[in-house]
């Protein structure tokens, strides 16, 4: 009986083994079949509009980086294409095609992209089809520029033009955060920047051009830049075309952008008790005694340690303890974490059979990141900020079938405010560039002044009137004094650009393709500076840990009231340009030619005037 049971069990085990093997083969076979059905291999050949093989065409699975390219004979093989995926065939100058599913072999015929072939770029005195340009030219579309939150066009170009190096200076403060541009490296001829032209007129810079006014930007980077601009174009040319109106109903566009700016990286904070512990550790490593006792470190952690709340002069003791055992974060004391920036824009465009129009009004407010005292307390405002109002009106007139005229008017009014720091850094008080050294000084001092240092102003509990500046004997000047107590610097700029041009098509009068173009532009630039300078006495602070007290000693006794100075300057420029143009197609041949002349007249020296006077309150000051 026992032997029979063993035989039955053995048979059952054999049956289980066979069943398991069959099931495993079924699963593997099903998985293999499923894998075979979930991906496929596709092949094909790509031809152009003339049925010629196209090498170098990209075939890629949409949403992935997996793809291949056609060989010299236009054929391709793409393996492991997931079921249900989209395969795209693309080539520069041709319209993209999507391969339909359900096939494994394709014959693809690409169609030229007519829009790309007709795309034009601005070149010197006119426009040219992009496909026919042989020089090194980069273009930037207006839609790309309007995506940025930058308030300056020169900063917005950074990273959007190949070979363009943009180096920002001025400390990054509002109104003085300009960028110096170089094409193909900073080692340009005499270290000069590219020549800048807006609608064909030479400009000193493009920082005030509203990005909502720009239609396109072309950057000439090789010999094509010197063909018509000579040595001025040796470092490249940046050509900016502003927007024009199109025939049709009026289109109104309103936009508002609110953003906040901040430093990309900020230093970590060191607390006062952490400094004391690290200082003791450093002295211990040198075999020296500790500078701060455990009691002092404990009081830095809790300034109210050991005080009796029932004491009659408890409030006074609290004030004194907090002044002695301070934990100052000078970086945050001098600099804000976030700064607001606002931008509003309104434009309208349209046209009729006689005139096309584009009108744009823009406003920008850029706040500063300095933590300054209240203007009501100081009597003036040393904060960094910029306000700019800009206007552009482009009108195009169709006088006759062959004669057109354009009138472009652009203007801006800008107000830039900042602390009066020019004289502190050995520069011209009227110069804005010294702001760069101010920011460098602030960041340096915020990391140099110890968190246990009292300040930034005196306290009346220790024998000196409150509110006086505290200096530190290991620094040349106090950062608090720089941004608050030295005065203010206001720069007001106004600019007006007027441009009139005519274009006469002589195709019917003389010969087909011949035209004459003339243009005159008159620019005026006015600048007014109002600066208030003052000086206050400063003190040193000494901490007495034995008595939990502070003492002040006079450092600089020199004082002077707020002294006002103003500068005014103005200059103008007259720009005249004319050209004869010829463009005609003979069969498959395009013939173009141009003869041009230009003249620039102006007064670059301007008119400067200086006035000095003293003012008691220095409140609500306008130029």
Briefly describe each language-model feature range.
Residues 164, 245-252, 348-357, 397-407, ...:
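Secondary-structure transition into beta-strands, especially the periplasmic turns and strand N-termini
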Residues 2-392, 405-406, 472, 607:
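Short, small/polar-rich motifs associated with maturation and membrane association
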Residues 141-145, 409-413, 520:
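Conserved short loop/turn motifs at secondary-structure junctions
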Residues 364-388, 418-420, 425, 487, ...:
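Small-side-chain secondary-structure face that scaffolds active or pore-lining regions
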Residues 197, 214, 391, 518, ...:
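Extended, hydrophobic alpha-helical segments in both membrane/secreted and soluble proteins
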Residues 275-288, 295, 299-326, 426-478, ...:
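Surface-exposed loop/turn segments flanking beta-strands in extracellular/periplasmic regions
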Residues 263-266, 322-362, 366-370, 382-476, ...:
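Flexible loop and strand-edge segments within Gram-negative outer membrane beta-barrel domains
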Residues 185, 242, 346-352, 393-397, ...:
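Residues on the lipid-exposed face of transmembrane beta-strands in outer-membrane beta-barrel proteins
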């Amino acid at each position: 009986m026992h032997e029979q049971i063993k035989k039955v069990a053995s048979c059952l085990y054999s049956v289980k083994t066979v069943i398991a093997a069959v099931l495993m083969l079924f699963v593997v076979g099903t998985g293999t079949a499923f894998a075979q059905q979930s991906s496929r291999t596709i092949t094909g050949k790509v031809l152009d509009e003339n049925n010629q093989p196209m090498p170098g065409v990209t075939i890629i699975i949409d949403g992935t980086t997996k793809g291949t390219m056609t060989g010299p004979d236009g054929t391709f093989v793409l393996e492991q294409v997931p079921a249900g995926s989209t395969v795209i065939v693309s080539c520069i100058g041709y319209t993209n095609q999507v391969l339909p599913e359900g096939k494994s072999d394709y014959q693809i015929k690409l169609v030229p992209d007519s829009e790309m072939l007709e795309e034009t770029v601005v070149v010197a005195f006119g426009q040219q089809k992009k496909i026919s340009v042989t020089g090194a030219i980069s273009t930037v579309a207006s839609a790309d520029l309007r995506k940025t939150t930058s308030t300056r066009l020169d900063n917005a170009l950074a990273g959007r033009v190949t070979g363009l190096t943009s180096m920002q200076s001025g400390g990054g403060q509002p109104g003085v955060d300009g960028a110096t541009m170089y094409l193909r490296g900073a080692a340009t001829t005499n270290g000069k920047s590219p020549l800048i032209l807006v609608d064909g007129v030479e400009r000193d810079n493009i920082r005030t051009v509203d990005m909502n006014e720009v239609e396109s930007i072309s950057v000439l980077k090789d010999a094509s830049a010197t063909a018509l601009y000579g040595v001025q174009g040796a470092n490249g040319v940046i050509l900016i075309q502003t927007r024009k109106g199109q025939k049709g109903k009026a289109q109104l566009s309103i936009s508002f952008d609110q953003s906040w700016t901040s430093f990309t990286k900020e230093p970590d904070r060191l607390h006062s008790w952490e400094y004391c512990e690290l200082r003791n550790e450093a002295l211990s490593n040198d075999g020296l005694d500790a500078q701060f006792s455990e009691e002092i470190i404990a009081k830095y952690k809790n300034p109210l340690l050991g005080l009796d709340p029932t004491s009659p002069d408890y409030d006074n003791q609290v004030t004194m303890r907090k002044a002695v055992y301070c934990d100052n974060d000078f970086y945050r004391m001098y600099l804000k974490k976030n700064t607001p920036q606002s931008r509003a824009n309104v434009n309208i465009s349209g046209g009729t059979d006689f005139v096309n129009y584009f009108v744009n009004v823009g406003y920008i407010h850029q706040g500063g990141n300095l933590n300054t005292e209240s203007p009501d307390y100081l009597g003036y405002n040393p904060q960094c900020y910029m306000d700019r109002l800009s206007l552009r009106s482009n009108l195009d007139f169709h006088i006759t079938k062959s004669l057109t005229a354009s009138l472009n008017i652009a203007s801006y009014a800008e107000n830039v405010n900042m602390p009066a720091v020019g004289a502190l850094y050995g520069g011209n008080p009227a110069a804005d560039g010294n702001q760069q050294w101010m920011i460098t000084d602030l960041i340096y001092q915020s990391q140099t002044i110890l968190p246990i240092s009292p300040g930034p102003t005196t306290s009346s509990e220790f024998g000196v009137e409150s509110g006086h500046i505290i200096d530190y004997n290991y620094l040349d000047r106090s950062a608090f004094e720089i941004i608050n107590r030295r005065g203010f610097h206001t720069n007001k700029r106004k600019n007006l650009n007027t441009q009139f041009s005519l274009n006469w098509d002589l195709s019917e009068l003389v010969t087909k393709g011949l035209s004459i173009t003339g243009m005159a532009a008159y620019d005026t630039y006015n600048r007014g500076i109002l600066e208030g300078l003052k000086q206050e006495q400063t003190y040193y602070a000494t901490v007495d840990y034995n008595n939990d007290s502070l003492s002040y000693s006079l450092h600089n006794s020199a004082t002077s009231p707020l002294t006002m100075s103003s500068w005014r300057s103005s200059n103008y420029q007259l720009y005249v340009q004319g050209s004869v143009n010829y463009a005609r197609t003979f069969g498959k041949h395009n013939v173009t030619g141009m003869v041009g002349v230009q003249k620039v007249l102006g007064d670059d020296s301007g008119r400067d005037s200086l006035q000095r006077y003293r003012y008691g309150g220095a409140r609500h000051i306008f130029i």
